[in-house]
């Protein structure tokens, strides 16, 4: 068995189990676009160093891919109270199909998350502008995958205290290097979602 594949699966399992032990605020999100649906479950905990977030998620696209992910980030309030930044890691595991090609995705990527709350003087409805970027170079990709990148941006409308409507954009790009040579899959989509906090 390929050593990179074994190491990738071990790291992925460690990241998943590390997120299970933390608890504080929970966030459950479901969003859907034209051909994809995504679900997320995050746990947010205040620790001595800042805000620790762990989470699991999955994206299913009927055009040919299934991707599960796990994240671990640490952040704190920046110098502005409206701005929150998080840095961490994101593990991804999935299967991609494109035409007659089929590849397995396993990667550990660097993750950046940012959220800016628009002041109430500008908007009467509480709105957050959220962005997320994850990148895994060749050295952190396993199985058939050679490079992984995803980007997400959204407007989060807080309609009630614990519920948010999300309007967003998502972009995913994966490069493979397997016995059929190098090939890529990319997908972008607008989506609408709903998030509950409890």
Model-identified regions with their sequence ranges:
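Small side chains
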Residues: 19, 39, 57, 68, ...
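Short glycine/proline- and aromatic-enriched beta-strand/turn motifs that initiate or cap beta-hairpins
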Residues: 21-72
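Outer-membrane beta-barrel proteins and related beta-barrel translocases across Gram-negative bacteria
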Residues: 27-30, 42-46, 73-81, 85-100
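Generic N-terminal leader/processing signal
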Residues: 2-3, 7, 74, 96, ...
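Short connector loops at helix/strand junctions that flank enzyme active sites
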Residues: 51-53, 65-69, 82-86, 105-109, ...
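Outer-membrane beta-barrel transmembrane domain signature
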Residues: 78-82, 91-198
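Cleavable N-terminal export/targeting peptides
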Residues: 1-25
